[in-house]
Amino acid sequence: MSDTNPDCVIIGIAGASASGKSLIARTIYNELTAELGEDQIGVITEDCYYKDQSHLPMAERIKTNYDHPAAFDHALLAEHLKQLMAGKAVDIPTYSYSEHTRTDQTIRFTPKRIIILEGILLLNDSALRKLLNVSIFMDTPLDICLVRRLARDVQERGRTMDSVLEQYQKTVRPMFLQFIEPSKQYADIIIPRGGRNRIAIEMLKSRIRHLLLS
């Protein structure tokens, strides 16, 4: 908390893949945008900070353990957050799930009063935790996460069911148990029942309003 900026509220939402992080982030974004204006709030996804693998052949890229902390450039993410807190715009990288590497495009992100950051391993990184005003962990059962992940990755990311299940068994579940679930201890708020938990959403919105006024 020592590295936070009172003029910029950063909310970190962590938890297993397909636990409801993106849904609750979008819901809070949409509802607070209607209340405060779209120039006041923005969402950043940890997936954008997967490390560039363009120097590797595709056969090597697909072997990467994407659920391990080493797959992410958390140092760049932390630096971008610090720049945004200082009132400077940043160029966020974009990532291709089909190519397993970053694209050539970036997204210009201007400073906001509220930044919602969502990703599986946010609370595992001590440098990122220090930048968060509120840290949240989505405590959704793994079997529900797997069903959601299957539907998402097959329908939206062009994956096959077999490849999704193989990845889940080899890396997703083991990395959840090793890195993601233990990071729950750092959460200020633990949210059960996924991204449609209205009580949790209203509580978060109330907390954000309080931080903006304090």
UniProtKB/Swiss-Prot annotation:
Family: Belongs to the uridine kinase family.
Species in which this protein is naturally found: Tolumonas auensis (strain DSM 9187 / NBRC 110442 / TA 4)
NCBIfam families according to UniProt: PRK05480.1, udk
Subcellular locations according to the entry: Cytoplasm
Gene3D superfamilies, sorted: P-loop containing nucleotide triphosphate hydrolases
Keyword terms, alphabetized: ATP-binding, Cytoplasm, Kinase, Nucleotide-binding, Transferase
Protein name in UniProt: Uridine kinase
Molecular function terms from GO: ATP binding; cytidine kinase activity; uridine kinase activity
Entry superkingdom: Bacteria
Enzyme class (EC, first level): transferase
Main location per the UniProt record: cytoplasm
Sites where the protein binds ATP: 15-22
HAMAP family: Uridine_kinase (MF_00551)
Catalytic activity entry: uridine + ATP = UMP + ADP + H(+); cytidine + ATP = CMP + ADP + H(+)
GO (cellular component) term, any one: cytoplasm
Classification via PANTHER family: URIDINE KINASE
GO biological process terms held by the UniProt record: CTP salvage; UMP salvage
EC number(s) on file: 2.7.1.48
Listed pathway(s): Pyrimidine metabolism; CTP biosynthesis via salvage pathway; CTP from cytidine: step 1/3; Pyrimidine metabolism; UMP biosynthesis via salvage pathway; UMP from uridine: step 1/1
Protein's UniProt keywords contain Disulfide bond: no
One family name in Pfam for this protein: PRK
